[in-house]
Amino acid sequence: MNVMDAVLPLTIRDAARARILLRSLARHFEGLGTLWLVCPATELPAIEREIAPVSDGLNVVLLPESELVPELRHTPWLKGWYRQQLVKLAIHERVRSELYLTLDADVICVKRASPSAIAPLGLAPCHTVERDIHADWYRSAQAVLGLEAPRKGISHNVTPALLHRRAVAELAAHLELRAHNGAFARGLRGISQRLVAAAAGTRCWRLLLAAGAPFTEYALYYTFLEATGRFGQYHFHSGSSLYDDEGSFWRADARDFSGWSPTPALRGDGAPWFVVVQSNTGVSPAEVEAKMQGCVSHV
């Protein structure tokens, strides 16, 4: 695989963080295809202005959320996190590469990366840990899918990750069939799905998910693949994530950031290729940029 598309859901609030990400991709990611930047329609002009100075060398396509997921107009209460997850799945209908990279604005590419290095033999790496970190994610996935997860007490990697567009299409087809057959979830989740479907006058997989929140994209995706025996067609079990879990900054106390350094993540070749400085920590984009320095400057 020589070229790999990527998707970045974005709001204007995180545009400054996205500028750091885009500069890091331009420097380090060889073979990046189209970067699908999906944002609220009302924010698109402002976001376009914000990213224009750092888009050289990147094939950025801005796409309104409402064009990719028109069903969102029926669920105006859906929070941004769930909207972004839906975007990461729905983009499979637009991407041109078999595998595509999911991104958030707080991700930074810190090493030379390429599609062939990240996905040897065209299969996407998937890292799991033997810890039940987010049991609620998997309970929600089983409820929405109507499937039983074959493995319990595990957690799959999160963003940045690689998804296979055919695998996502098969997940969408499964959800579409459930929506068409009225196979809604039990309890309040199912009541919401029924009411929204009736009000919208339509049933489709995107609406089923939007009305059936809470959900998480990776728990849905990997649970579906494992429960239906499809995992090995598209993924292999990897000893590490695309991102440096220990070297990323996840903590919610911004005061701890003074002691954080990206240096360990820069050593060596190969995985992990990314770090995350989570936006909800309160660390400003300027502080992140100062820490990263040469990692995000143009060569």
What is each stretch, according to the model?
Residues Y100:
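Short aromatic/hydrophobic "clamp" motif used to bind/position activated sugar donors
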Residues V110-L145:
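Conserved donor-nucleotide/metal-binding helix-loop-beta segment in metal-dependent transferases, i.e.
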Residues H156-W260:
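Catalytic core and acceptor-binding pocket of nucleotide-sugar-dependent glycosyltransferases
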